[in-house]
Design a protein with these regions (language model features):
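Active-site-adjacent structural elements that line small-molecule/cofactor binding pockets in enzymes
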Residues: 1-307
Length: 307
């Protein structure tokens, strides 16, 4: 089981805080550092010091880390034109020496679009499909060749399709709970399918839909990696679990029901159950980015048991 650190900087985190967490995750042996792509905090609090841009953040981390993979859950398709996104991700991949992964979604949080003057079109899913076709098409076009695309929402003419990523293929993540269109899109474009904040039962059903869609698309169902994103709250004892839950404003029993919470042994057991239904990666949503002892505990007493 591959454990990855997943952060929500819009809730209140500077670049320096994210750098500290990414370096700690790398030093502790985690395989990847991911972040959300949001410009407005959610729920209680003020979100200070304010949002950080996902790909500017990852560009900085690319130069200040050595091994850990870097990515987004998920880049909002509404924030970026597909040609520009292809350039940005390819450049960050070059800057990292080939450690970037792209999670791309349609965008869903209307309030942040209103807050920063970003259009929030009704046809987000149709745009997402064209964005995936364009980004992957640009990267797959040979050097010296031209890329053209004539879609409903985007048109590209005689694009040199540069720059190229350092990797031969940047892994693409697609995720969500949708029962029909999401599995089909994953089958067409994804290297990994991720379902966020889902129960074992719902995860198993959605993985099954994606596997069926992959087969229908002529792919092997096992060609994709299947993963979950779950909030994490681990403590050496009940008091420590309760303290960590309180800091992030959550109830312990709710966290145990909907995430990965409890003692290291309890969390290892629950992760194992996700593994049994086909998940091979867990993105650990870490909400208190100042608590590096939490990461150390997960590394030494959860990750070590799973490895």
């Amino acid at each position: 089981m591959d454990l990855r650190i997943f952060t929500e900087p819009q809730q209140g985190a500077s670049y320096d805080t994210l750098l500290t967490v990414a370096k700690a995750a790398e030093d502790l042996g985690f395989n990847a550092f991911y972040r959300s792509d949001h410009y407005l905090h959610m729920g209680a609090g003020n979100g200070l010091p304010g949002p950080t841009d996902a790909w500017i953040t990852l560009a900085g981390l690319a130069r200040e880390t050595k091994r850990i993979r870097l990515g987004t859950l998920m880049t909002a398709g509404t924030f970026r034109l597909p040609g520009v996104l292809a350039i940005q991700v390819a450049q960050v991949d070059q800057m990292s020496g080939g450690r970037v992964e792209l999670g791309l979604g349609a965008g869903w949080f209307e309030e942040e679009h209103k807050a920063y003057g970003i259009p929030f079109p009704k046809e987000k899913f149709g745009r997402l499909e064209e964005q995936l076709a364009i980004v992957t098409g640009l990267w797959a076009t040979g050097v010296g060749e031209k890329f053209n695309y004539d879609g409903t929402y985007y048109q590209l003419t005689d694009s040199p399709a540069l720059p190229k990523p350092a990797q031969a293929k940047v892994p693409i993540l697609i995720g969500g709970h949708g029962a029909t269109r999401t599995p089909r899109l994953a089958a067409l474009y994804a290297d990994e399918f991720n379902i966020p904040f889902a129960s074992l039962e719902d995860s198993e059903k959605q993985f099954g839909r994606v596997r069926e869609a992959a087969t229908a698309a002529g792919r092997g169902a096992d060609d994709l990696v299947y993963s979950n994103a779950l909030v994490v709250c681990v403590g050496k004892d009940d008091a420590e679990v309760a303290r960590r839950a309180s800091v992030i404003g959550r109830d312990v029993e709710e966290l145990k029901a909907n995430g990965l919470a409890g003692s290291p042994a309890q969390v290892v057991d629950k992760i194992g159950r996700y593994g049994e239904i086909g998940s091979s990666r867990i993105y650990l949503q870490v909400l208190d980015l100042d608590d590096l002892d939490h990461l150390e505990l997960i590394s030494s007493q959860v990750q070590s048991q799973l490895n």
